Amino acid sequence: MSTAKTLTLEMHLGDLMIGELSFDATADTFAVHYTKDWQQSGFPLSPTIPLDGTGTSNQISMFLVNLLPENKGLDYLIESLGVSKGNTFALIRAIGLDTAGAIAFVPKGALLPETQLRPIKAEEVIQRIEDPTMWPMEIWDGKPRLSVAGVQPKLNLFYNGKEFAFAEGTLSSTHIVKFEKYHHLVINEFITMRLAKVLGMNVANVDIVHFGRYKALCVERFDRRNIPGEQRVLRRHIVDSCQALGFSVSKKYERNFGTGRDVKDIREGVSFNRLFSLAAKCRNPVAAKQDMLQWALFNLLTGNADAHGKNYSFFMTPSGMEPTPWYDLVSVDMYEDFEQQLAMAIDDEFDPNSIYAYQLAAFMDGLGLPRNLLISNLTRIARRIPQAIAEVILMLPPLDEDEASFVAHYKTQLLARCERYLGFVDEVRDVEV
């Protein structure tokens, strides 16, 4: 029972209670206790919170903080609840029914809300796009509606192929609708995601939807599956790389204090070495490393310097982790005012324009992987991209003149990057490091 000193949330997977999350308000510490049945047959919240209950308060706190929205979404949540930013327990209690992954955090003895859908109208979305100060995208019906991590304006919604709605009860969000924060960002992410799909990568399904004249990106959640006719949505548990490593969201970049002269050499965040170390916890370590390598190379070729630790995730299963489909793929190279330093260094190089055969060879040597694996993957992907990007452009909805110019520039930059890497990739085999 929760008291003023000890507060408790039940952890539910569907109809099954798998354990409890408790918070000692006096000591300011968390604890997770799994049920005996779940310890026998289930999976942990994350690798750092094992089934034997030995996860530390700090590890549990880091896991929970990574579930929270960022920037304005978090600010609105804090304002609505009247709690401090550091009150992680209160924040999780507020959004715990529909966070990333499969686990719902439910107050003890609480009844689930009635199963229902609250449809959203295009006019309501347009109002929030055009006047976000008066009508924040994150606030609906007087309460925060954003419960997924990230900084981009977005809504997590139930979608049945016809209309979008907020879901309650046994239903939950099945899609994430992302709105433009930067020039042509929706088109950019659509192209990059579909390009990965055409190349045969395991990537989330995306489409462009319209609210009046405004475009938005509709992303199908791979941790959710709607069961038509049964009034329920199945969930699958996932963790991002920060959670899997026991890192806070502040360490999603390898240079966790930024790129300033006095702090750029502090590299305590998610790096490729740390990411690849997680393959040992996967059901198929070899396949996991192959997926990680392809993700790294695809991001180099598409100019996605912002591929950080929260942009690579894993399914949690009783037999180990498994990489999820890719997501949040954007060519940030298209925006001059974006940070163009890599989120994770290739060897010790953060400047993508300074990566050559030497850096790629040292990168593979440092990971303990054969250089030929990089050569074959990079060559195959780069050679297939010209045809693949042509196919993807045909998938776009009608574009205006400015959008068409953006797409043409995207293609030119993409093909130039492919030619650049193809020009020296064979040197990776024999270069001395």
From Swiss-Prot:
GO terms for cellular component: cytosol. Gene3D superfamilies: 1.10.1070.20. Induction: Expressed in late-exponential phase; part of the hipBA operon. Disruption phenotype: 50% decrease in biofilm. ATP binds at V151, Q152, P153, K154, K178, E220, R221, F222, H308, G309, K310, N311, Y327, D328. The modification Phosphoserine is found at S147. It catalyses: L-seryl-[protein] + ATP = O-phospho-L-seryl-[protein] + ADP + H(+); L-threonyl-[protein] + ATP = O-phospho-L-threonyl-[protein] + ADP + H(+). The active site is at D306. Monomer. Forms a HipA(2)HipB(2)-DNA complex with cognate antitoxin HipB; has higher affinity for the latter when HipB is prebound to DNA and HipA is phosphorylated. Binds DNA in the ternary complex. Toxic component of a type II toxin-antitoxin (TA) system; overexpression in wild-type temporarily inhibits cell growth, overexpression in a hipAB deletion leads to acute growth inhibition. The toxic effect of HipA is neutralized by its cognate antitoxin HipB. In the ternary phosphoserine-HipA-HipB-DNA complex the DNA is bent about 125 degrees; all HipA in the crystallized ternary complex is phosphorylated. In E.coli phosphorylation of HipA is thought to release HipB from the HipA-HipB-DNA complex, suggesting the complex functions differently in the 2 bacteria. This is Serine/threonine-protein kinase toxin HipA. It comes from Shewanella oneidensis (strain ATCC 700550 / JCM 31522 / CIP 106686 / LMG 19005 / NCIMB 14063 / MR-1).
